Amino acid sequence: MAEHPNVARIRDGYAAFAKGDFDVLTDLFADNIVWHSGGRNQLTGDYRGREAVFGYFARLMEVTDGTFHIDLHAVLADDEHGVALAIVTASRNGKSMTANEADVMHLRDGRVTEFWTTSADPYTVDEIFG
């Protein structure tokens, strides 16, 4: 079975995030994307619109002094949905974390319209992000 084209688009998006390539992310994210960041920390909330999501990314890097990193392991996708499995690492104030993460996406015409990030260790995530 051939790989769905959205798998490659999602993989490219994670690679672009790692490089800070916002041109690729601009193409991947719908203008009206909604990004859901769960937990009970300073980054928790719903970010509406591409610019708000990019602001969230900037804050994420600021809070972790640029140590936030995603190691992508698997991507599944079809026309309407995407799932990415990854390991996230970050450090802040002398504390470090490594956590498994599952990201779920709604897609329309190859663009991410909604995104949920879910950590297997939400308490550690909250501790790192304060």
What are these regions (language model features)?
Residues V34, K95, R111-T113:
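Residue-level signal for well-ordered, solvent-exposed loop/turn and beta-edge residues enriched
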Residues A90-M97:
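Short, cysteine-centered beta-strand-loop-beta hairpins and adjacent loop/turn segments enriched
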Residues F68-I70, M97-D103:
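Short, surface-exposed coil-to-beta transition loops
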Residues A30-E80:
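A solvent-exposed, acidic/Ser-Thr-rich amphipathic alpha-helical stretch
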